[in-house]
Amino acid sequence: MTDIKMIALGGVREYGKNFYLVEINDSMFILDAGLKYPENEQLGVDLVIPNLDYVIENKGKVQGIFLSHGHADAIGALPYLLAEVSAPVFGSELTIELAKLFVKSNNSTKKFNNFHVVDSDTEIEFKDGLVSFFRTTHSIPESMGIVIGTDKGNIVYTGDFKFDQAAREGYQTDLLRLAEIGKEGVLALLSDSVNATSNDQIASESEVGEEMDSVISDADGRVIVAAVASNLVRIQQVFDSATAHGRRVVLTGTDAENIVRTALRLEKLMITDERLLIKPKDMSKFEDHELIILEAGRMGEPINSLQKMAAGRHRYVQIKEGDLVYIVTTPSTAKEAMVARVENLIYKAGGSVKLITQNLRVSGHANGRDLQLLMNLLKPQYLFPVQGEYRDLAAHAKLAEEVGIFPENIHILKRGDIMVLNDEGFLHEGGVPASDVMIDGNAIGDVGNIVLRDRKVLSEDGIFIVAITVSKKEKRIISKAKVNTRGFVYVKKSHDILRESAELVNTTVGNYLKKDTFDWGELKGNVRDDLSKFLFEQTKRRPAILPVVMEVR
């Protein structure tokens, strides 16, 4: 009898961080190894990856890591996974080249080279499953769905996808192949849910291209385009419009340079004239109406860069009168307030702003109708909605019921849930560790909720430092309390509070020194408690308080 388990270490009840495990007997297949970028309250965190403990404990079972596409939410955790687990990595040509950029940039994995290029005709036979692939449509070329064939039926993972009948070559979904997979029999479908709550018509990429061309054609001065660097379909549209209107394209940002150069080398991006791309230092050689500045980076980075441009702090570009800023990325809900602030700054600097979402519904993910079409093609026995917040997964589940999938065969997972197939279907049998692992610089997992809470306090209420010198032996204060603050109050207007705080500390320490017993921790705790109470009464704020008590022997 074949034993089958399904586990989501990421990508459920959240956006990004796609990481799914399919276990068949003693074999483990990893579907995507993605990261996500931090939320607003995760201060100082660079990125977030899944908890890999379970995979590391079972690394001898791993048959391979199979990548659906080249975005960070599918490949970004690879360096951290490969530092612990040695396994072959499979993906399309572009996906593998972009994965190499991530892997080679990490000192722990820069020598790793067990990469394998596959395409929609590839079949790889393992002891416990046959892995194959099918073409999908997304905002990056050569995205693919993944099929694991078992004697119980196919297990299908879509990755990020949508249907676009007007998609250009390299972005087309293979509908015939999907129908064939459905005829073979699909045991379980793990399907993209990001856009499941919407039935709005998604603009085709040809419509998006026409809209972009119109915007650039109407612009009299420089056009500054803000895009996600790995959204290659959007970057190709920028190149096409630039060529059509006699403009040169300036790439700013290391990510944009690396990704675009890689895609050009592989001919996944096409330009008709190598002179189209110019260096930032050469901008002064051209008139404003001859330039498009492409500010492309990771998710959220283009908006941060626009803020610097508008404030005059960007390395290469300062927004000026006549500039048009064209935002062709869809900001996350968490970034909407920031986008509004940046728009204000741009207008103050003399520029103007257009968002691609003003006139078009743009997405790289299937809407409700597309999801139902996919389910009708594949006819899965079981559905696991993945890739989305809970509301998206629940909407996907409802869509599945409408096309005839039994409610008891639809499973909305929590991260770490172990789903085991038996005679009654997939049943929940416990879980594995699946908490977020936060990366801060080179520190992996050292940033927890306590650290984030402290950072939040520091960012909102600042820090209050008080230093005092005592003689434990003589039971007296040698040097009275001195106070310093950062981010708490404006010192020039708060002399009274600081003076009274110092006097309070002198009193607290003086009273403590009269006691027969002496404990450094207790003394600092008393100072912290008394100060905290006083400062809250005076300011209604609770800064982080750092008492420094020094001893003279």
Curated annotation (Swiss-Prot):
Induction, per UniProt: Expressed in cells (at protein level). Part of an operon including SpyM3_0658 and probably SpyM3_0659.
EC number: 3.1.-.-
Needed co-factor(s): Zn(2+)
Recorded phenotype for the gene knockout or disruption: Essential, it cannot be disrupted. Depletion experiments show is involved in decay of Class I mRNAs (they decay rapidly in exponential phase, are difficult to detect in stationary phase). Involved in an early stage of degradation of Class II mRNAs (more abundant in stationary than exponential phase, show biphasic decay kinetics).
Record's keyword terms, sorted: Cytoplasm, Endonuclease, Exonuclease, Hydrolase, Metal-binding, mRNA processing, Nuclease, RNA-binding, rRNA processing, Zinc
Entries under Gene3D superfamilies matching the protein: 3.10.20.580, Metallo-hydrolase/oxidoreductase, Ribonuclease Z/Hydroxyacylglutathione hydrolase-like
Pfam families, per the entry: Lactamase_B, RMMBL, RNase_J_b_CASP, RNase_J_C
Residues bound to substrate: 361-365
Binding site for Zn(2+): 69, 71, 138, 160
Location in or out of the cell: Cytoplasm
HAMAP family: RNase_J_bact
Similarity remark: Belongs to the metallo-beta-lactamase superfamily. RNA-metabolizing metallo-beta-lactamase-like family. Bacterial RNase J subfamily.
Quaternary structure annotation from Swiss-Prot or TrEMBL: Homodimer, may be a subunit of the RNA degradosome.
Function recorded in the entry: An RNase that has 5'-3' exonuclease and possibly endonuclease activity. Involved in maturation of rRNA and in some organisms also mRNA maturation and/or decay. Has an overlapping but not completely redundant role with RNase J1 in the decay of mRNA.
Protein name per the record: Ribonuclease J 2
Organism of provenance: Streptococcus pyogenes serotype M3 (strain ATCC BAA-595 / MGAS315)
Taxonomic classification: Bacteria, Bacillati, Bacillota, Bacilli, Lactobacillales
Name of the coding gene: rnj2
